[in-house]
Amino acid sequence: MNNVLKFKIFELHCFVQKTYADIKIACDIAIYQENTSKYLISLGFLNKSYMTYIEAKRFYRENEELVSVEFDNFFDTYDKLELELKKVISTEDKNPSLLHSRFDQFQQKVENINDLIKVLQNAR
């Protein structure tokens, strides 16, 4: 694998990790916090994760050599998670069990990407 491709994979992986970190905080706040401002705080982290997600998707589309089912699944699952989190925030849902389930699915897709990156790092 050439160095340019390795750099692009690393760059996309960084976008994935940043998106994951912010959406995780947004979901954790919406699911577990017990205060009246939790939805506003969650929305802030959702916005932050969405900005990184958009940048990741742009980078992915511009670099066709990065196309893989793992990244496609990441983007599809993020879209579903984002919609569910918006629903929880907009309705101030007190029982976000579907959000929890969607986040677990998203987390699995991130783990799949992490596994792919490990395999690619070991490939010479």
Residue ranges and their predicted role:
Residues 76-124:
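Amphipathic alpha-helical binding modules
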Residues 3, 10, 33, 40, ...:
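Register-specific recognition of a single heptad position within extended alpha-helical repeats
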Residues 23-37, 56-63, 85-96, 120-124:
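Secondary-structure edge/capping motif, primarily at the C-terminal ends of alpha-helices
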Residues 15-22, 45-48, 52-55, 77-84, ...:
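Amphipathic, well-ordered alpha-helical segments in soluble domains
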